[in-house]
Each structure stands twice: as structure tokens, then as C-alpha cells.
Amino acid sequence: MKQHDEERHKRIVVKYGGATLADHERILKAVTAVAKEAKKGTQIAVIVSAMGKTTDQLLSAAKNASNGKVEKGELDEILAMGERTSIRIFAAALKAQGIESRYFDPLDPDWPIITDNVFSDANPILDKCEEKIHRYVLPLVEKGVIPVIAGFVGRTPDERITTLGRGGSDTTAFILAKALGADELILVTDAEGIMSADPKIISKPNRLPDIDVDTLVGLADSGTKFIHRKALRYKDSS
């Protein structure tokens, strides 16, 4: 991320994982934290995942109801509904706290995450993403309006919905943070910081007080669920 520029307000990108949005109480906690920071003058962009285990439930329902014959393109449209619901709830909750926001849906003309057509594991086309972010998302951030963007979801140049595969919301967050020149990227999960192992499997994993990209890649390769290696392709090198 870029170094803090004293001539402008601090700018952050925050991504909320599904477990942190699992019910109305957790959503309210997340929204209140964002609203509090926004009232300090911080410029914020928010990326949200689907609530709780919504994606798994949609996947199971679609596959079982179709006897496993659902096409990948159709499945992506179904799975995207989780995030498309989350952005609407999050934006409405911000509005209820007096915070101006605007959600970005993948069917909007100014949707910023453009991908190839590898359904279920699509790859963002970075130059197209950055052009859209600079044109449509950045002006909102600079005005103090909070964009709420669906993580995990993309759209092809011919306007078909895609999903980005495992770690897709993190991929969205890294792309937004880099293109917006964010001072900070915050990935909010249900773990207490970045752990050396999955705390749901290992009873006493170590909490890592500081971390570099090489270590993140190692954790990703080991199967640690904090972040997926694909998302790290899009991390700012700074």
C-alpha cells in the first residue's frame, strides 16, 4: 500500500469475511466500526463476503437440486447471490447510521472487477479493473462516500457473472487496495489475527505479530485458511 499522504485523509480498504457477517449482530458490529472510522474522516472502501455459510448452502442446493448437472456459468450466477445480498444489507445498515454509501452489484454498468470467462475460478483482467476503479470507485472514496463491493464476484467483458474461486474476496480486496492507493488493507476474519495454523484444527496456534509476503505464501501453501495463494498475486509489492 502507499505511504500515508499528509495532504489527504487516511484511506483504507476493509474486507469482511463471511463468518464476521454471519448474523445481524455481527453485521451491526462491522457496520458500527466502519461508521465510527468514517466519522473521523477516514476514506473507506468495504468488500463483503456472503453471510456465514451462505455460499456453501447455495452450492449444495444448486448441485443437489440439479443432480450435479448445473453448468459452471449458471452456478456462478447462483453463488454470487450471497455477496449480492450482503452488499445491500451492509449499505442499508450504513445508511441507518447516517453514513453515505453506495453498493456495487456485478450487473451495474460501472462494476469494477472484470475477469476472463473461466467460470468458478475466474482471473481478474487487471488493467480493466484498475480503469474501472479509477473512474467509478475512486471519486466516491475521495468524496467520503463508502463503496460497498461484493467480494468473490466478477463479470466478463460480455457481462456474464463469474466467481473468483477460493480466496476470491481477498483477491477483490487486494485489487481495490492497490488501485485506490490505500494506506492500509484490513482483512477481518473470525480468527484473532493471523495464526500459524487453523485455530479450528490446532488447539493452540501461534499468533503472528508481524508478517511478510513470503510467510503469507507459505501459510497459503500449507492450507491455512486465512488467505489463499491466488489472492497474493494481486498484492501491492510495496
Each language-model region and where it sits:
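Nucleotide/pyrophosphate-binding catalytic subdomain
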Residues: 1-234
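Short, intrinsically disordered, charge-balanced linker/junction segments flanking boundaries
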Residues: 236-238
